[in-house]
């Protein structure tokens, strides 16, 4: 299981991304529409002054149960270990063992 601090850090990043998403999108659009280089640089500076963790690139998918960052299945939001256990217990509707 992942360190609790890592899970909380990731949740904090998700909150920051949601909080600044609109402002970030507006600034990026203004940068594209800016005509002069000085204007673009000023807008780019404003974009850089936003918190670093408010960028969606810094997010990392983690398992909802264990917080594991690797082996993550987006469809379920779970790591491969938890997915396998829950599938065997029949807790995931529509998931069956493969047979061919």
From Swiss-Prot:
It is found in: Plastid, Chloroplast. Keywords: Chloroplast, Plastid, Ribonucleoprotein, Ribosomal protein, RNA-binding, rRNA-binding. It holds the Pfam family Ribosomal_S14. One of its GO terms (biological process) is translation. GO terms for cellular component: chloroplast; small ribosomal subunit. One of its GO terms (molecular function) is rRNA binding. The keyword rRNA processing does not apply. Its main location: plastid. Part of the 30S ribosomal subunit. Binds 16S rRNA, required for the assembly of 30S particles. NCBIfam families: PRK08881.1. Belongs to the universal ribosomal protein uS14 family. This is Small ribosomal subunit protein uS14c. It comes from Tetradesmus obliquus (Green alga). The gene is rps14.
């Amino acid at each position: 299981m992942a360190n609790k601090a890592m899970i909380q850090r990731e949740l904090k990043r998700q909150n920051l991304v949601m909080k600044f998403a609109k402002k970030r999108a507006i600034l990026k659009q203004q940068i594209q529409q800016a005509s002069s280089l000085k204007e673009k640089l000023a807008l780019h500076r404003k974009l850089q002054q936003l918190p670093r963790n408010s960028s969606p690139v810094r997010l990392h998918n983690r398992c909802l149960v264990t917080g594991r960052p690797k082996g993550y299945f987006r469809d379920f939001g779970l790591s491969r270990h938890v997915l396998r256990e829950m599938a065997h217990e029949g807790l995931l509707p529509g998931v069956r063992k493969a047979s061919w």
